[in-house]
């Protein structure tokens, strides 16, 4: 089992996307990249911790590759807006890839360079994986548990539509 650690805005949105991908065994919403140990959602939302909302993805590389996960990541959030995804503004919503090894770093660098070659101004941060702090239980599988919640209804369906149209071959049955 491999792991990936991505931040692309609200973790509810990112989690909802990656739970649809075959080979993804588990997605855990949480926090990483800041200076506060064991931060709470409220602390992260205040913006003082410097943590990003992230998802830790456990995946089977025999079914989906890290590079494929990177493709999904970049296609389902805006990697060109600094510290913002839609109406969510703040460093906690930054676009970030935390890598666990040199292979992941190189794959991310290659993907970012390919996007830059297409004239996209990518602001995604690329850093070694820091300590990951799981978010509170009520954040886990949030969209699955709260599909009619207002924010979820607004923000997640467009991401899932994009996922289904571009990555049908990666979807769980």
Swiss-Prot record:
Its EC number is 1.8.4.11. Gene3D superfamilies: Peptide methionine sulphoxide reductase MsrA. GO terms for molecular function: L-methionine:thioredoxin-disulfide S-oxidoreductase activity; peptide-methionine (S)-S-oxide reductase activity. Coiled coil: none annotated. It catalyses: L-methionyl-[protein] + [thioredoxin]-disulfide + H2O = L-methionyl-(S)-S-oxide-[protein] + [thioredoxin]-dithiol; [thioredoxin]-disulfide + L-methionine + H2O = L-methionine (S)-S-oxide + [thioredoxin]-dithiol. The active site is at 10. GO terms for biological process: protein modification process. Keywords: Oxidoreductase. It is an enzyme of class 1 (oxidoreductase). Belongs to the MsrA Met sulfoxide reductase family. Has an important function as a repair enzyme for proteins that have been inactivated by oxidation. Catalyzes the reversible oxidation-reduction of methionine sulfoxide in proteins to methionine. PANTHER family: PEPTIDE METHIONINE SULFOXIDE REDUCTASE, PEPTIDE METHIONINE SULFOXIDE REDUCTASE MSRA 2. This is Peptide methionine sulfoxide reductase MsrA. It comes from Acinetobacter baumannii (strain AYE). The lineage of its organism: Bacteria, Pseudomonadati, Pseudomonadota, Gammaproteobacteria, Moraxellales.
